[in-house]
Amino acid sequence: MTDAAQAPHSPKFPKGTRAVVLTVSDRCFAVQQDDVSGPVVLRLLENLGAESPLAETLPDELEQIAAALLRHAATAALIVTTGGTGLAPRDVTPEATRLVCDRLVDGLAERMRAEGLRETPMAALSRGVCGVISKQGVPGGTLVVNLPGSPRGAGTSLKAILHLLPHALNLLAGRTGHASELAPGQDSATPGAIHTEGT
């Protein structure tokens, strides 16, 4: 089944949305194994309308992960990480994410874990978080989403929240039309969208 077939009603990202995929893995960084999860995430984001998403591979080093998140937050609306969310001593992606985020979006992480548990009880061991990095002097912020490192886990987790991400990015940008009030295929930046406060 294709990605598009699994999520046929997912709204598209706002036009011009910039996204970044960070693969966090010592072995991938050292070119000791191929990155198979990053391409899965990239394809899903492209299908949703992300504009030429960037990809970068990082080692499991807290400081380097945090620095990369802050660097990309200067230009990207969405950063998706894959890897480093488990219980191994060097799994520090959630810690790096918490370090740079001003607000956590617990509901997204809970939704991903709930969907993962439908496939495997091992999903309970994922510590991934989601949060927002505020932009200095600029309205809105960058949404950060932590995914597991396995291709299946990353794909399942991201698909669980794909339909929520466009509305989340609209809200961060100050466009507050309720998703339930938008016509099919219309985001809240579209002329004629109904605008209300809150979510």
Sequence positions of predicted segments:
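Non-catalytic beta/alpha edge segments that cap or flank active sites
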Residues: 1-199
